[in-house]
Amino acid sequence: MESTFVPDMETKIETTNTGGKVLAYDGDELVGRLDFSFKENVLSIDHTYAYKEGIGVGSLLVSAINDYAVSKGLRVMPVCSYASVWYERHPQFKDLLVTND
C-alpha cells in the first residue's frame, strides 16, 4: 500500500493549567489529535489519535508538542506508545525525556 504524505498540514496547540491538546488539520479537516498533561516541569504525552493513517499525522503531532516542550523548557514523558516509538526514532531528543519509573 502506498502512503501519501501531506506536507501542508497545520497544527494548533490549546493549553490549560493542567494540560491540553494538539490538533492537526489538513485544510479545514481535523485529521489528528494529541492529548497531554502537565506535572510541574514535565509534559506527559498521554494519547495520540490519527484520524487519517499513512500521511504523517502522528509524527506531525508529536513533533509539534516536542517543539512546544523545548520552547517552554519542559521535560517530556511519552506515556502514549506512539510517542515512545517516535522518541526512539529521534534519539537527538533523548535528553528531554523522563521515565515513569
Residue ranges and their predicted role:
Residues 55-67:
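Conserved acetyl-CoA-binding loop-helix of GNAT-fold acetyltransferases
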